[in-house]
Amino acid sequence: MWRSLGLALALCLLPSGGTESQDQSSLCKQPPAWSIRDQDPMLNSNGSVTVVALLQASUYLCILQASKLEDLRVKLKKEGYSNISYIVVNHQGISSRLKYTHLKNKVSEHIPVYQQEENQTDVWTLLNGSKDDFLIYDRCGRLVYHLGLPFSFLTFPYVEEAIKIAYCEKKCGNCSLTTLKDEDFCKRVSLATVDKTVETPSPHYHHEHHHNHGHQHLGSSELSENQQPGAPNAPTHPAPPGLHHHHKHKGQHRQGHPENRDMPASEDLQDLQKKLCRKRCINQLLCKLPTDSELAPRSUCCHCRHLIFEKTGSAITUQCKENLPSLCSUQGLRAEENITESCQURLPPAAUQISQQLIPTEASASURUKNQAKKUEUPSN
């Protein structure tokens, strides 16, 4: 709950939406008029909070984003955030147009996916957006947030929190299109938040101690040599001011984008990169061990002390900096997020050992971590 409050507070304090390509003058203003064929999606969504996702059908990560957007829609609806319009605009390129149907099939009929015409004015350009950007508008069509990578990853809570703020807070002033039903709902949400804040004791910030370990933050020199902050093939948007306030990170901004916009502090960026890499239970790992090794029946949850973040195209790779022990080398893959991680195998919890039923004589053993059931959790970094 405190994590959610921290995110909400950080987003409330934003003077900008979190993307270097966004001109601050566009905030709290309606976007340039755009249409696809004979449809005007923004006009059709007047009176509701509107979420515009710029996704590319030829991009594997964008396909995953579309699937997660559908999950987010269902989640928010169950929580009572029902007056939201979702719009996906596919890239204009030929490869994306050919895979339009694949992108459309990843969402329900409640999320329209628009395919741009080859010769029309590019909607992405009109909106000053890039691949995987999320633009969030209030009920009067005014831009509240423009989130870009890595903050637009739906594995992070930033897009969800930004939608909730646009839904219940008047970031751009009053809107005459807000219904009494929505106002009543937001009042209940506000009261519930206050009640939880009063009832919940002050948290002990164990994570601050956690960050003091030497392996938690990597210097900028440990990034891939091929990764240039602001390179066209691997854009990294700057951290919106205050977005990481609850982590108490401080640092000077560095310049790296051609437009000379502020880039995030090194610690903030590294922390985000670790969040991308660190997944408590990787779905399936194969631990290659000698048949006579005592470790053979014990492994498969993994831990790496020093992660190096790399982004190549649509792939996100997390690798161990140190050499892995000769008796235990693992390679895991999260297929649904295209994240590869090298790791060290660790002894999993007893419940996990029992459920794995591994055979000691096998040269290799595989296990599946039941993270959702909370029966098998991998050691965190």
From Swiss-Prot:
The C-terminus is not required for endocytic uptake in the proximal tubule epithelium. One of its GO terms (biological process) is response to selenium ion. Phosphorylation sites are present in the extracellular medium. Glycans are attached at N46, N83, N119, N128, N174, N338. It comes from Homo sapiens (Human). Residues 1-19 form the signal peptide. The modification Phosphoserine is found at S266. It holds the Pfam family SelP_N. GO terms for cellular component: extracellular exosome; extracellular region; platelet dense granule lumen. Its main location: secreted. Residues 200-268, 355-381 are annotated as: Disordered. Made in the liver and heart and secreted into the plasma. It is also found in the kidney. Might be responsible for some of the extracellular antioxidant defense properties of selenium or might be involved in the transport of selenium. May supply selenium to tissues such as brain and testis. Residues 204-216, 243-255 have a biased composition (Basic residues). It is found in: Secreted. This is Selenoprotein P. Belongs to the selenoprotein P family. The keyword Secreted applies. GO terms for molecular function: selenium binding. Keywords: Glycoprotein, Phosphoprotein, Secreted, Selenium, Selenocysteine, Signal.
